[in-house]
């Protein structure tokens, strides 16, 4: 596909936002690819559901606090996306299990073109989402999966994106 054709497609690069160090690599890569191809970045933050409690008020308070934290985290990284792409990202905040909510979002939002994840640079493995979607759940994706090595420097990411 030519560069011009990809620009008209409005490619959307989805990044799952969390507090892991490698997530920054996925975000940087997605932003640079979006800018170079005339696309956009979308960000997904998945809140853990509150554990079952007897009192609904406690669950409601836990949800409010989790939502506030999600909004703060995603706002911080949305600012990074704006600085790298010049445009605000699409923002999705959901509650549930990360891999389930990620799969649902990709199914529901037909504008998403590429899923960008970063592998953890620790010896514990690449991370749960990379493990899931590069493995058994990969056949459920309707979009390509790009895995950015978590150990890359910003300069190395810039060179490949």
What are these regions (language model features)?
Residues 1-5, 82-115, 155-161:
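Structural beta-alpha unit
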Residues 26, 53-56, 103-104, 127-128, ...:
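Short, well-ordered secondary-structure micro-motifs
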Residues 37, 85, 133, 140-142:
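Short, structured coil segments at secondary-structure junctions
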Residues 3-57, 140:
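Small/aliphatic-rich secondary-structure junction motif
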Residues 42-44, 90-94, 146-148:
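General small-molecule cofactor/ligand-binding pocket signal
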Residues 11, 112-114, 142:
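Conserved acidic residues
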Residues 45-72, 155-161:
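Acidic, proline/glycine-rich short linear motifs
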Residues 116-140, 152-157:
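Glycine-rich, Arg-bearing micro-motifs that act as flexible, cationic patches
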């Amino acid at each position: 596909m030519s560069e011009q054709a990809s620009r008209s497609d409005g490619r959307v690069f989805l990044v799952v936002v969390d507090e892991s160090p490698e997530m920054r690599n996925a975000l940087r890569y997605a932003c640079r690819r979006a800018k170079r191809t005339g696309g956009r970045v979308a960000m997904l933050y998945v809140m853990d559901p509150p554990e079952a409690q007897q009192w609904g008020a406690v669950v409601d308070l836990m949800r409010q606090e989790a939502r506030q934290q999600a909004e703060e985290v995603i706002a911080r990284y949305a600012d990074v996306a704006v600085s790298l792409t010049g445009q605000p990202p699409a923002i999705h905040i959901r509650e549930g299990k990360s891999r389930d909510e990620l799969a649902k979002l990709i199914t529901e939002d037909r504008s998403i073109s590429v899923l960008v994840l970063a592998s953890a640079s620790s010896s514990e493995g690449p991370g749960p989402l990379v493990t899931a979607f590069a493995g058994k759940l990969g056949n459920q994706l309707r979009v390509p999966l790009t895995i950015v090595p978590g150990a890359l420097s910003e300069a190395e990411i810039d060179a490949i994106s």
